[in-house]
Amino acid sequence: LPTTGAAGVISRGNTFDLLPFDNRLVAITNVSAADVKEILERSCSVGTSGGGQFLQLAGMKVTCSRSGTAIVVSNPTGDSYAGNVTTVGTRVKDVTLLDGRALVKDGAVVANAPAVTVVTTTFTADGGDNYPTLAKLVKVGFGVSYEQALYDYLLSFPKNAAGLPEIPSSDVRYSKTTGDGRFTWLP
């Protein structure tokens, strides 16, 4: 985890180097399938081009198509919190919870789809990076920084012979070739 990429002891300094902002974790409860789709449309509009705007997912599988229309969020003041959706996106094709329940199928929100809870940082939950859908929803704070959550998570892995946390090679979530399929891009 050191910024050099070399193996070694994981320190709070390492996680602060990676996540230097004072973001706290928050839960947003009762997020409708329609809101989930709009939030993911924003994520799919920026793709994986960097900048931190592409959301990291857990608990669901998402399929997006690059050929769909990207959501457009206006930002007349240049403030990343002031955006409004001006063009509806059509890139999100399917969203399925890991228990198999569908939220979005073939680009349409599924009738009677369950509401979900979203956990994210205060920056994103408050609409940062032009996520206006998140900004309008009710949040419950944990009081834990995302840096602390990362530190605790890394230390939760089994220790290797040198006493360092190590991801088991059998954990498909971290496979460089396949991953666990949380996100799929279609042409």
What are these regions (language model features)?
Residues 1-187:
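Catalytic centers of hydrolytic enzymes
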